[in-house]
Amino acid sequence: MISLSLLYRILTLPIILVGTTILYFTIGTNFPHDELRHNLLSTLFCSSMLHLSKGLTVKDVRIFFHDSIGSTLLKNRKKLNSENELPNYGEKFTHKYDNQDMPDSVWLAKVNGMTKSDPIILHLHGGMMALPYDKVILVGLSNLYKLFSTTMNRPPSILLVDYSLVSQGYTYPKQVRECLNVYQVLISKGFRNITVLGESAGGTLILSFLYQISELSKLNKVVWPKGVALISPWLDLTNAKKIGSYRANDGLDVICYETLNRFGKAYVNNEESLFTSSVVNINMNCDISIWSKIPPIQDGKVLVLFGENEVFRDEILSWTSKIGLLKAYPNRVLMDKQGIHIGLFLEESPSIGPGMTNLDIWKKKFSVNSLYTFLRETFEE
């Protein structure tokens, strides 16, 4: 049964939508970013996302959000791949085996005649470790592939990892193990031109498995990703306090402290011993002697994108400073002015309203251009 907290949010949603619409046409809403000021539907989507998420529980996610990546791609084929621009769309790569910590993974696009040197984007999605792949993310990724296909003879194939979710009864560290295992399968097949991309919780998983690779490297020879791209990474899952940008940007972003804290603790199965764990909370895991020796970070092959108005802003700036990245490569830590959480997808790649048909215009947007430029440089080196 739906939680009372979410039911209340659903019943009061029309009031929020009416109020947001009035503000949009008068003094402006809480989302002042240029992309949202000129797109009412996207602004309403962001307002709805914030309002509903405040009442969302893990149980609600289990009821309403349960599609696998395969079924999500099938449902959205007309939206994402209407002209068959994404080769081998939906093709399986790995199959789920719980006892081996292996999840399903699926190609959003895989170039024909793929070779070991072809670039690959390994994507880990966000959603507080509880929500599955969302169409909003897939629209942005499909646009990204289409953009690369106009500028590269061999555009990067994009592999989607459908890792196990808290809403399915799976908790830490299964998600980290699954994502690392898919990466290891790619490595075992000889692929080396791999850049790992993740937003929000996906960013956490990337950093967690980089740390695991670092630990493995003490005993064995390892293969590192060629590049790492983090969009609004969630760095403090269970130990955050409602101070700084968590408080200052409350109501200006699409997520809030209370919801994040609730889902973060569910990720560790409410084990209090893990609430202050530096393995779970990457922002507490900031030993510069470790992170500065991880090749993608050491060589500046890492990009961190986040918004000025998002609640994660301060912890992202703090962590990138503590590990030395902000000082060594300031051009790799980029803040979108007045941007919100995962703005590349919510602000610049709307999945509702007017679609992005002009890729030349799309690639000039701040976050898109930053990611595109970084990926292209990484692939071609």
Swiss-Prot record:
A motif (Involved in the stabilization of the negatively charged intermediate by the formation of the oxyanion hole) lies at residues 125-127. Its EC number is 3.1.1.-. The keyword Transmembrane applies. Its main location: cytoplasm. The chain crosses the membrane at residues 10-30. GO terms for biological process: meiotic cell cycle; sterol metabolic process. It is an enzyme of class 3 (hydrolase). The active site is at S200. Coiled coil: none annotated. Glycans are attached at N193. GO terms for cellular component: cytoplasm; endoplasmic reticulum; endoplasmic reticulum membrane. GO terms for molecular function: steryl deacetylase activity. SUPFAM superfamilies: alpha/beta-Hydrolases. Residues 1-9 are cytoplasmic. Keywords: Cytoplasm, Endoplasmic reticulum, Glycoprotein, Hydrolase, Meiosis, Membrane, Signal-anchor, Transmembrane, Transmembrane helix. Belongs to the 'GDXG' lipolytic enzyme family. Required for the deacetylation of acetylated sterols. Has a role in meiosis. This is Putative steryl acetyl hydrolase mug81. It comes from Schizosaccharomyces pombe (strain 972 / ATCC 24843) (Fission yeast). The gene is mug180.
